[in-house]
Design a protein with these regions (language model features):
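Non-catalytic, C-terminal membrane-associated alpha-helical segments of glycosyltransferases
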Residues: 161-214
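Acidic donor-binding segment of Leloir-type glycosyltransferases
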Residues: 1-21
């Protein structure tokens, strides 16, 4: 059974849904923007094809958002491999600001739920190959609180052949984000990319060390 048929099967009689098929490959950023534009829901949630939501993720997350009048939340998550084995854990801070995100970003896209009213034409996913979500989080951090829920509500799959695993592409896109979109000068951009690289290496080392305990 192909993925589309499987999705239709599990969603049948459960929720209202609409499947949008692009006529050509336009990239993940543009595809998400189209989905947001066609949505009429109050909230938008994301789930990449290889990630796993925990059973009560949306229920728990929306309860917290409504109770605390929040517009943007994300959660802690497990990192898993292609065999669903836990290879790391990521715990999130309660609040993130722009000054935090410009240094490093551990927000898992598939853990995010956001109010659709925040996502306007000027505030949508970028068109880079890997940092399209990071770019949007930077923009949104200037106008709303980013609230981290310290509960593991997602299993984020780490695969060697995914775009997010392409380190050189990551740093190239980070350079474009800082230089061309965040309008940083060349020296500041180089400094920010170097700092991002250091945080990335520290995180990778920490994850490798933590694997001993799983």
């Amino acid at each position: 059974m192909d993925d589309l048929k499987y999705i239709k099967k599990i969603l049948r009689n459960r929720i209202k849904y609409k499947i949008i098929i692009n006529k050509k490959n336009i990239g993940v950023g543009r595809s998400r923007n189209i989905g947001i534009q066609k949505s009429n829901s109050k909230y938008i949630a994301f789930c990449d094809a290889d990630d796993l939501w925990h059973k009560k993720k949306t229920q728990l997350q929306l309860e917290i958002m409504k109770k605390n009048k929040l517009s943007f939340t994300h959660s802690s998550y497990n990192l898993i491999n292609s065999k669903n084995k836990i290879i790391g854990k990521m715990r999130v801070k309660k609040f993130l600001e722009y000054k935090d995100l410009i240094k490093s970003c551990d927000i898992a896209l598939s853990s995010v739920i956001i109010k659709r009213s925040l996502l306007k034409k000027s505030l949508n996913f970028g068109h880079t190959k890997t940092k399209e979500d990071y770019l949007l989080w930077l923009k949104l951090s200037k106008i709303t609180k980013i609230y981290g829920i310290n509960k593991t509500l997602l299993s984020w799959r780490k695969t060697d052949n995914s775009l997010s695993s392409d380190v050189s592409q990551k740093f190239y896109d980070a350079y474009k984000v800082y230089k061309n979109i965040e309008n940083k000068n060349v020296l500041t951009t180089i400094f920010l990319v170097l700092r991002l690289s250091i945080f990335y290496l520290i995180k990778k080392i920490t994850q490798k060390l933590s694997n001993v305990f799983y």
